Amino acid sequence: MAGKPVLHYFNARGRMECIRWLLAAAGVEFEEKFIQSPEDLEKLKKDGNLMFDQVPMVEIDGMKLVQTRAILNYIATKYDLYGKDMKERALIDMYTEGILDLTEMIGQLVLCPPDQREAKTALAKDRTKNRYLPAFEKVLKSHGQDYLVGNRLTRVDVHLLELLLYVEELDASLLTPFPLLKAFKSRISSLPNVKKFLHPGSQRKPPLDAKQIEEARKVFKF
């Protein structure tokens, strides 16, 4: 029997959080080995575990996978969260790319220089309210199902829920004009595996604080 996937990353959200979310939604238990010092990262590099000398890295099925999208694609395929055919997969990919674009925009706000934060936060809110959330509200309305693609859970539902929770952290009022997205959020949050991941004490990570940012800067030298 194969062991649990092992996730190598800093003890924070970053580019690993969507991977944690997808594994959790699939009901897959995983272990985490946190990179806590520059030496930890250097050892992974010297041991040949990081193809491009960067994390996240996931050990799964005898492989050491890097690149977030490649990891997500593998997990989604392995656990049947990638649609039933090529057309569904194309929609899933298209929606996912938009979700990840906004997720990254919001996630980067905490790292903005103070003199840029107000403007970039305003831009993120504008894109959220006027570009991305209307697009997904429209998808839910036209598709008429509980899920974004097909009639069962896929990876894109998990990614969208994660994004909606980040939007709430940014400004909860941004969701107010979108009743279908609000209902979607409640519906997906109530799925047993997702509900468990949302419960305190899970491997879900909180927003970055100043201390974590400083520790990350020391480890990753950015």
From Swiss-Prot:
One of its GO terms (biological process) is glutathione metabolic process. It comes from the Eukaryota. The modification N6-succinyllysine is found at K4. Its EC number is 2.5.1.18. One of its GO terms (molecular function) is glutathione transferase activity. Glutathione binds at Y9, K45, Q54, V55, Q67, T68. Residues 85-208 form the GST C-terminal domain. The modification N-acetylalanine is found at A2. It catalyses: RX + glutathione = an S-substituted glutathione + a halide anion + H(+). GO terms for cellular component: cytosol; mitochondrion. Residues 3-83 form the GST N-terminal domain. The keyword Magnesium does not apply. Expressed in the kidney. Keywords: Acetylation, Transferase. Homodimer. Heterodimer of GSTA1 and GSTA2. Belongs to the GST superfamily. Alpha family. Catalyzes the conjugation of glutathione to a large variety of electrophilic compounds. PANTHER family: GLUTATHIONE S-TRANSFERASE, GLUTATHIONE S-TRANSFERASE-RELATED. This is Glutathione S-transferase A2. It comes from Mus musculus (Mouse).
